[in-house]
Regions:
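Acidic phosphotransfer microenvironment of two-component signaling modules
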Residues: 24, 45-49, 117
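Two-component/phosphorelay signaling modules centered on CheY-like receiver
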Residues: 23-42
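Hydrophobic/aromatic residues positioned on beta-strands within the core alpha/beta folds
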Residues: 93-94
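Non-catalytic signal-transmission and effector/linker regions of two-component phosphorelay proteins
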Residues: 1-18, 111, 115-139
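Acidic, metal-coordinating helix/loop segments flanking the phosphotransfer/catalytic sites
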Residues: 43-61
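Short amphipathic alpha-helix used as the core "switch/output" element in two-component signaling
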Residues: 49-52, 72-86
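Active-site residues of response regulator receiver
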Residues: 65-66
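Conserved phosphotransfer cores of two-component systems
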Residues: 55-57, 80-88, 99, 104
Length: 139
């Protein structure tokens, strides 16, 4: 006999997060904290690697440094997310102020250096508010 488990009884799927950062230590630290919080993390050392990940699998959140020195920067990755991946939460990080452009919107901005736990907390709050919105019949 086949038993079917109601969807409500299934454990929640882990949030899939791309961390695009060219500074190795920053990327590793953010990824480690997010993994410790139960998120599934994919690392990219530049914008092009981030775009490649997005082309191969669905993700929930993209966190990108704006200024990366090699092969596509974070701004290119952010524009790709907004153009090709509607519904993905976009988090920008930089030591400088966020760019003011009419063609780019983002969901959060963190000024470097930032505690990686702040991003983990933001993702959890975002997920909770999105789930509450959907359950209310408004989403």
């Amino acid at each position: 006999m086949i038993s079917v488990t109601p969807e409500a009884d299934l454990p929640p799927k882990p949030v899939k997060v791309v961390v695009a950062e060219d500074e190795v230590l920053v990327r590793l630290m953010v990824a480690e904290v997010l993994r410790g919080e139960g998120f599934q993390v994919f690392e990219a050392s530049n914008g092009q690697e981030g775009i490649s990940i997005l082309k191969t699998m669905p993700v929930d959140v993209v966190i990108t440094d704006l200024r990366m020195s090699s092969r596509a920067d974070g701004l290119e990755l952010a524009r790709y997310v907004r153009t090709h991946c509607p519904g993905i939460s976009l988090v920008l990080a930089s030591a400088q102020a966020p760019p003011i452009t009419e063609d780019l919107t983002f969901d959060a901005f963190f000024i470097k250096p930032y505690p990686p736990e702040d991003i983990a907390n933001w993702i959890r709050r975002r997920r909770t508010s999105t789930r509450d919105h959907a359950e209310s019949g408004l989403g």
